[in-house]
Amino acid sequence: MADLNKDTVNFVENYDGTESIPEVMPTKIPNLLINGSSGIAVGMATNMLPHNLTESINAAIAILESPDLEVEDLLKIIPAPDFPTGGIINGTQGIIEAAKTGRGKVILRAKTEIETDKKDKSKIIVTEIPYQVNKARLVEKIAQLARDKRIDGLLEIRDESDKDGVRIVVELKTGTNPEVILNNLFALTPLENSDGINNVALVNNVPKVLNLKEILDIFISHRRAVSYTHLRAHETVED
């Protein structure tokens, strides 16, 4: 939003012509890469995953200092997407492919731990869940599997989440193998989830699939255009 009122970007009419809206925002950080984006239009779709703020800015700075950097170099700065709900990325091949081509797949697992007491009674504790997984529906799915006896050994499911974070407790029957139960939960519930990456964005009003370097290059070009326009406007006022 900074400098939006200083004629740094073009304004266009909204859908019914009643207001003027900015064609793009004069952002100072690579928001598209940081926040990600998801949407469907006629004949195309986009699913860009979120990335770490500091890593994204550092990557942009690295390109400014060394414009010939390759995607492989940028992956040392931004090794993977950064999900607000946490989770564990299972494998990196899909991430590398997406960084190079703009398309790929990432498999995300919940972060879990197993607690076993002296009576051989175990609990599976879930402390982070995959990106965009609804926690209430996840808990209900596990409970439904227990009711339908599709997974033997489930005793009780509780959502103990609070302001400090996610905590889902899955109590198991005595003598049950918790590793087997956990693998079944990964297979049958969104505790393991795959996300397709499709980095489609409008570049000069034309949809294009972008790799990691292209996303950052376009952001840098945008910032240069905004800064140049701002400078010219400032000089005009002084004249």
Language-model features and meaning:
Residues 44-104:
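Conserved glycine-bearing catalytic or ligand-binding loops at nucleotide- and phosphate-handling centers
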